[in-house]
Structures are given as structure tokens and as C-alpha cells.
């Protein structure tokens, strides 16, 4: 095995998906603790606690206690290199989250044991299903009251349409929580409260049919054995092939706050989740062990460092090896550049990187030339597929409080649009600026970031736009005719693309009927 193949085999790149408050931030910290990346996990006790979670670093996230921006953390574990991508936990952030999920090879689903499957989880699982992403499941908060575990598994299967195979099974919950039993290994992992902040080796009791196990379970023993027989009779067994194809999820139980069960999940990612896989480009499939470097940008993030007014483009490496100072071709611009200062991430700690391999995420300094979906290679003209823009569902007109700051407003919105935080439209017939979003919170985020980072205060006004469609047509003459007739509702988006802003659903249906040669598209691939 070559050094490059060995490095690729060590990589595991995954994201955590969950509903807000299911414990994603806490489990992120505990995973980093497993990888010795942070010495003490700063707990996220209350939303106002001073020690903010390491991965939630933007001002508004600190205030709201939700991870709005996708950060990337890399840490070593069991001779593997783990790349963990944090996804926005708020229900609004489907675009950003979707694109993050295009950059991973597997995902960890965190469920609140008291609540089960929640709406946000369903939406994220739909996205994972589009690419058959393998899913590992963690049922969290066993140190509180939870629903019947068998009921939770049934719900996963019925609602998320995926087979659930329990690997561990909880012994009690809340004050009676005594640990978990490993179904195939026939051993008990004992839970002792009070070790949430440090790495500790949990006590293991070999064999359920032992005096030690009887003593540990006490009067819960008989009912637990009965429940296990039921579970083993009714549940699916783990099957590696079904897991890799996204048809079955191994399920683990624990408490992230108590730092219990998190290592079982990380072991599953190392043992079962796929190493970096081949990536489909328009031209061909690119294999991770190919010698030549390729990668695509899935996210752009402004102002990660308040000290530097910068933007970072997050790139997933698909093949080859990044070496400091290497030459790359920026395919869309057909331009060669030398990259000497790529970053690797430990949340908002950044380090300059000497080398990186397929599966790794690196950060490139971006001065406005890199866009989401851009491909970088060592010369080959490739374009990776499947990194879309969605048509926004909500629209607002932007009103500037200080008219003298219109230049800063445009510049700020242009940058936020490039980053994917919002979509911006400039109508052909007016000087208005219209923002589009997939969820209401995005408007708040944009207003607060314009104020914090660009010193521009704005307000929003309602506007009669039902949806946006990207316009294209093979017949140039027809397109010109359409542009003349539909001028009132046409706009140019932040990327310079012609867009139709439909005032109502009926209007859009009529236009599509009237102009059969014009393509009205609800998504646009990043090219």
C-alpha cells in the first residue's frame, strides 16, 4: 500500500445531524475530548454560560446557543484521522447544511431519548438519503427520563424509513441508569455519573449471565433479561453492506453530557463507516487514491477571525495530496495559483498545513474569486456534481437606515451571498435589493452580521414575491423576447444569473405555460 493509499484508508469524514437541543454541541465536544483535542470539555450548561462550546463561535450563535455556521474539526483517534463537520442545528439552515452533507462520507444522527425523531432530523435524513449516506445513530440523554427504547427504534424505522439495529441496550434511565449492555459482545459497560469533563475508562462486566452482572443490576436483572429477549427477537441485526448503502443504522445509547457511550459511536465510525469514496464529476468519477490533486468548495465563511477581515473557502479534497506551496488550477476561471497558506481546522483555532489527503477539509483564503461549487485540480478540467442552490421560499426588500452606506450594504450582501448565508436579487426595473432565504432566521442572521461586520444597519419590508426561478433558454431570440415581456419580474442574482421573481403561484404556472421554450428552474447547480 502506498503512503497515499494508507493515509486515505485512515480518514473518516462525517457530520452530525440532529434537531436543535438534542445535544449535538455537547457530543461534538465529547468527540473532541476522545481525540484529546481539548483537555477539558467546556460544558454547554446554559445558553448564557460563559464557556461557550468550542465549535459555536460566531456572535449570534453565542447568543442563541445554536450552531449557525458549519465549522470543521480534525482530530486523531485510534490511529485514524477524523474530520468532523458541524452542521447548523437550526431548522432554517437547509442550504448550508445540505452543502455540508455533500462533503462527508457518513453521518452521526443524534436523537433526544425523551423526544425521539423530530422535524429537523427528518429533513436532514431526507438530504442524506439523496446520496445514500451511511448513518450511525446515538440516542442521547439517558441520564434523564426517556421514552421506551423499543418504541424509539420503531419510530426510527417508521418515520425515517431505515432499519434500526441496536448495538448497545440501555439498563434503566435517569436515576436508575446503570449503563449499557453490548448485544453482540455480551458485556456491560458501567455508567458512573460525574465524569462528563474527562476521559475515563468505563468499568466493563463480562457476560450478562454472571454474578457480577446480577449484583450490578440488582432487582432490575430479571426484567432486563426479559426485555433483551424481546429486543433480540424483534430487532434487525447489524449488516455492514446495508449500513454502507444507507439502508440500516446501528443504534447506540448513552449520555453526551455524562460523556458515556460517545466512544462507542466513534468506534463505530472508525470500524464501519467508509473511508473517503470516489466522487462523481461531470466528466468522470474521481477515485481518492489517484495521484493528482482534486477538490471542490462546499462552503464559504466570512470573518472566521475578527482580527482578520477575511473569508475562508472550505474545500473537500477528493483525490491526490495537498502540499504546501503547490500549484492548482481554479477550473472555473481557468487560472493557475500557488497555494501556500491552506488551513486545517480545530474549530476556530487555525493552523497552517503542510499536507492533506482525500477526505480532509482544508481552508483557502478567499478574496472574492472563489465561489461555492468551484473545483480545483492540477490541470484537468473537472466539475464535481451535486452542489445545488435552492430557490428561496421567503423574500424581503432591504431598506437601508443610512442611505450613504449603500456601497457597504451591496458589498456586505455580495459577500454573504457568496458564502451561502442568503441569496440576493437585483430587480431589472428598480434599485431595490431583495433578499431570499429558506428560513426566517436567515434574515436575522444577515441583519446582525451586516451590523457587526460591515457596520451597516438595515430593516426589512414585505414584498410580493412567491418564489424565484432561474431562467435559461437555448433559443437566444426567444430569451430576448421573454426578457422584454417579463421585465417587471426579472432580476439578476448575486452570481449574475437571470432570475424570474414570481409574485404568485398562479403567475408562475401561467408563465411556464405561455413560454414553453423557457426553462424555469427551482435549483441551480454551482458551476
From Swiss-Prot:
Instruction: Give the coiled coil ranges.
Output: none
Enumerate the subcellular locations listed in this protein's record, separating them with semicolons.
Cytoplasm
According to its UniProt entry, one GO biological process term is: regulation of translational termination
| Pfam families according to UniProt | EF-G_D2, GTP_EFTU, RF3_C
What GO molecular function terms would the record report? GTP binding; GTPase activity; guanosine tetraphosphate binding; translation release factor activity, codon nonspecific; translation release factor activity, codon specific
* UniProt KW keywords: Cytoplasm, GTP-binding, Nucleotide-binding, Protein biosynthesis
Entry's SUPFAM superfamilies?
EF-G C-terminal domain-like, P-loop containing nucleoside triphosphate hydrolases, Translation proteins
Source taxon at top rank? Bacteria
Q: Does the keyword Ligase apply?
A: no
Q: Which residues bind GTP?
A: 18-25, 86-90, 140-143
Please give the family membership noted in the entry. Belongs to the TRAFAC class translation factor GTPase superfamily. Classic translation factor GTPase family. PrfC subfamily.
Indicate what this protein is called per its UniProt record: Peptide chain release factor 3
In which organism is this protein found? Pseudomonas putida (strain ATCC 47054 / DSM 6125 / CFBP 8728 / NCIMB 11950 / KT2440)
Task: Please spell out the taxonomic lineage of the organism that makes this protein.
Answer: Bacteria, Pseudomonadati, Pseudomonadota, Gammaproteobacteria, Pseudomonadales
Amino acid at each position: 500500500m502506498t503512503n497515499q493509499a494508507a493515509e486515505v484508508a485512515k480518514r473518516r469524514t462525517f457530520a452530525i445531524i440532529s434537531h436543535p437541543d438534542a445535544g449535538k454541541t455537547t457530543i461534538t465536544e465529547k468527540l473532541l475530548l476522545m481525540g484529546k483535542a481539548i483537555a477539558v470539555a467546556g460544558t454547554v450548561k446554559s445558553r448564557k454560560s460563559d464557556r461557550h462550546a468550542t465549535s459555536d463561535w460566531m456572535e449570534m450563535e453565542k447568543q442563541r446557543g445554536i450552531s449557525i455556521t458549519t465549522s470543521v474539526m480534525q482530530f486523531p483517534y485510534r490511529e485514524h484521522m477524523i474530520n468532523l463537520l458541524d452542521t447548523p442545528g437550526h431548522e432554517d439552515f437547509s442550504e448550508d447544511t445540505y452543502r455540508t452533507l455533500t462533503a462527508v462520507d457518513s453521518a452521526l444522527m443524534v436523537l433526544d431519548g425523551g423526544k425521539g425523531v423530530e422535524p429537523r432530523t427528518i429533513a436532514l435524513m431526507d438530504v442524506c438519503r439523496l446520496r445514500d449516506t451511511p448513518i450511525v445513530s446515538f440516542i442521547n440523554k439517558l441520564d434523564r427520563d426517556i421514552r421506551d427504547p423499543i418504541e424509539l427504534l420503531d419510530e426510527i424505522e417508521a418515520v425515517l424509513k431505515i432499519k434500526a439495529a441496536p448495538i448497545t441496550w440501555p439498563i434503566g434511565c435517569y436515576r436508575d441508569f446503570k449503563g449499557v449492555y453490548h448485544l453482540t459482545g455480551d458485556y456491560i459497560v458501567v455508567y458512573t455519573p460525574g465524569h462528563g469533563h474527562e476521559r475515563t475508562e468505563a468499568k466493563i462486566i463480562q457476560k450478562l449471565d454472571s454474578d457480577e452482572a446480577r449484583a450490578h443490576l440488582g432487582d432490575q436483572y430479571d426484567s432486563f433479561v426479559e426485555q433483551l429477549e424481546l429486543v433480540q427477537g424483534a430487532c434487525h441485526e447489524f449488516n455492514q453492506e446495508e449500513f454502507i448503502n444507507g439502508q440500516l443504522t446501528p443504534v447506540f445509547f448513552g449520555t453526551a453530557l455524562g460523556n458515556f457511550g460517545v466512544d462507542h459511536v466513534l468506534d463505530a465510525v472508525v470500524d464501519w463507516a467508509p473511508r473517503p469514496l470516489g466522487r462523481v464529476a461531470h466528466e468522470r468519477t474521481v477515485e481518492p487514491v489517484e495521484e493528482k490533486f482534486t477538490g471542490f468548495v462546499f462552503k464559504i465563511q466570512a470573518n472566521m477571525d475578527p482580527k482578520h477581515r477575511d473569508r475562508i473557502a472550505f474545500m473537500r479534497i477528493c483525490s491526490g495530496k495537498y502540499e504546501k506551496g503547490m500549484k492548482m488550477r481554479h477550473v472555473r476561471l481557468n487560472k493557475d495559483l500557488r497555494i501556500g497558506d491552506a488551513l486545517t481546522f480545530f474549530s476556530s483555532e487555525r493552523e497552517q498545513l503542510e499536507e492533506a489527503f482525500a477526505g480532509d477539509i482544508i481552508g483557502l483564503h478567499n478574496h472574492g474569486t472563489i465561489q461555492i461549487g468551484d473545483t480545483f485540480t492540477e490541470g484537468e478540467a473537472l466539475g464535481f456534481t451535486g452542489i445545488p442552490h435552492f430557490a428561496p421560499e421567503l423574500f424581503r426588500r432591504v431598506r437601508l437606515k443610512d442611505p450613504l452606506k449603500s456601497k457597504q450594504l451591496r458589498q456586505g450582501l455580495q459577500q454573504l451571498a457568496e458564502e451561502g448565508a442568503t441569496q440576493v436579487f437585483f430587480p431589472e426595473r428598480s434599485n431595490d435589493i431583495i433578499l431570499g432565504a429558506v428560513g426566517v432566521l436567515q434574515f436575522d442572521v444577515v441583519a446582525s452580521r451586516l451590523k457587526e461586520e460591515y457596520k451597516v444597519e438595515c430593516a426589512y419590508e414585505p414584498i410580493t414575491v412567491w418564489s424565484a426561478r432561474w431562467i435559461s433558454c437555448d433559443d437566444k431570440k426567444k430569451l430576448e423576447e421573454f426578457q422584454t415581456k417579463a421585465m417587471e419580474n426579472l432580476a439578476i442574482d448575486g452570481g449574475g444569473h437571470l432570475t424570474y421573481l414570481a409574485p404568485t403561484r398562479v403567475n408562475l404556472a401561467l408563465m411556464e405555460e405561455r413560454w414553453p421554450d423557457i426553462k424555469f428552474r427551482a435549483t441551480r447547480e454551482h458551476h
